[in-house]
């Protein structure tokens, strides 16, 4: 069904707008150990992302799809319309209608407030990739700030790795029998708003979301042994984003208060990024990232120490590295990401993730326990059409 929609969408657009741009991607992940459920070490995937963009002064059309095929894990296969919207621009407002992706947040390591779109949970370890969300969005720009009002038409359930996949829970996820607290199930219309403004060097945003939680809880599956079923509850979440720029220092913070997902809880990510411009009298910039995480539901508050090298060359070369430290459970995670353009046609990126855990059973809640055999290196090659 979705493939038919893709074809029907692409062909008229090609006739109207001409050439289709896009990306072809080859992705290979090598895991250093066999998985806890005897999954293979080597996983590769191909993806194709066609895209069309047209800006006619007071009207904008955007189409982007993503099709992914994984060599081992059927759970990573994806046919998704990520953008298919029309924006009408008026003198005092903008109206967007269609499928789109909206990002909220200012911090680097955990985007607490970012809730409009469902996470593409099989794409990356950081959870930053999103699925398209049908919506109507009205944007009002006034002297007191920018107000975005959303009607979110229907719900996208989270995707999970299959039984042959990596970076998955020890128990399989029974996605097909997902449960909902709303009688409308995945047809419920959710609502959200976000107000944002800036005052000199201070950026601030306040948001509220009322609808089906993008993050499920898990219950024992009634018809599968050793399996869990996602349970999506109706929640209310209020969020605050703050970013203050002081020369080369950026102080950032996000905090949410959520009800409906079990007991009401508060979660926050806050920290700073200090940038050394012209590091060691070169053209490179070096950024130091320090962020702390808090969640009322967890007994520990892991923090992140990271660096970001920007080479400022014609190839847009960058290296990002960081340690995730959980002092109470004595866990340590390390992440390395590097990317570099190859001419104007291609991009090569590398990613490495390492988990370290003490063998000591100290009685503390473990964050990485399910991933202790999932240290990996990932290479991704993108060809721009």
Question: PLM features: residue spans?
Answer:
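Repeated loop/turn-to-beta-strand initiation elements of outer-membrane beta-barrel proteins
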Residues: 20, 57-63, 92-95, 144-147, ...
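Outer-membrane beta-barrel translocator domains and adjoining extracellular loop/strand segments
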Residues: 32-43, 72-80, 108-114, 160-166, ...
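Outer-membrane beta-barrel "beta-signal"
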Residues: 272, 354, 371-385
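Outer membrane beta-barrel
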Residues: 53-166, 200, 353, 357
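Residues that define the transmembrane beta-barrel architecture of outer-membrane proteins
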Residues: 38-46, 77-82, 130-134, 141, ...
């Amino acid at each position: 069904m979705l493939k038919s929609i893709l074809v029907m969408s692409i062909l008229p657009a090609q006739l109207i707008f001409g050439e289709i741009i896009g990306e072809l991607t080859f992705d290979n992940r090598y895991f250093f150990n066999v998985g806890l459920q005897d999954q293979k070490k080597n996983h590769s995937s191909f993806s194709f992302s066609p895209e069309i963009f047209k800006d006619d002064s007071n009207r904008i059309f955007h189409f982007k799809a993503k099709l992914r095929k994984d060599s081992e894990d059927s759970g990573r296969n994806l046919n998704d319309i990520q953008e298919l919207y029309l924006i009408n621009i008026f003198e005092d407002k903008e109206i967007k209608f269609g499928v789109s992706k909206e990002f909220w947040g200012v911090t680097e390591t955990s985007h607490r407030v970012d809730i409009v779109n469902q996470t593409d949970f099989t794409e990356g370890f950081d959870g930053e990739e999103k699925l398209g969300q049908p919506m109507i969005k009205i944007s009002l720009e006034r002297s007191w700030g920018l107000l975005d009002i959303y009607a979110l038409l229907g719900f996208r359930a989270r995707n999970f790795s299959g039984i042959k996949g990596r970076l998955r829970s020890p128990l399989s996820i029974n996605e097909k029998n997902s449960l909902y607290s709303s009688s409308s199930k995945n047809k419920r219309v959710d609502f959200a708003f976000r107000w944002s403004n800036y005052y000199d060097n201070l950026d601030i945003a306040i948001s509220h979301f009322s609808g089906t939680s993008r993050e499920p809880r898990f219950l024992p599956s009634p018809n599968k042994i050793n399996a869990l079923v996602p349970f999506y509850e109706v929640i209310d979440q209020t969020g605050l984003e703050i970013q203050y720029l002081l020369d080369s220092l950026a102080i950032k913070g996000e905090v949410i208060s959520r009800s409906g997902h079990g007991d009401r809880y508060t979660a926050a990510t806050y920290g700073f990024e200090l940038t050394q411009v012209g590091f060691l009298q070169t053209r490179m910039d070096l950024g130091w990232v320090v962020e702390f995480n808090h969640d009322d539901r967890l007994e520990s508050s892991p923090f992140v120490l990271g660096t970001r090298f920007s080479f400022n060359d014609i190839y847009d070369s960058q290296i990002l590295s960081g340690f995730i430290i959980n002092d109470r459970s004595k866990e340590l995670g390390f992440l390395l990401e590097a990317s570099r353009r190859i001419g104007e046609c291609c991009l090569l990126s590398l990613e490495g993730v390492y988990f370290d855990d003490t063998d000591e059973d100290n009685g503390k809640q473990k964050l990485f326990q399910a991933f202790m055999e999932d240290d990996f290196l990932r290479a991704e090659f993108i060809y721009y059409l």
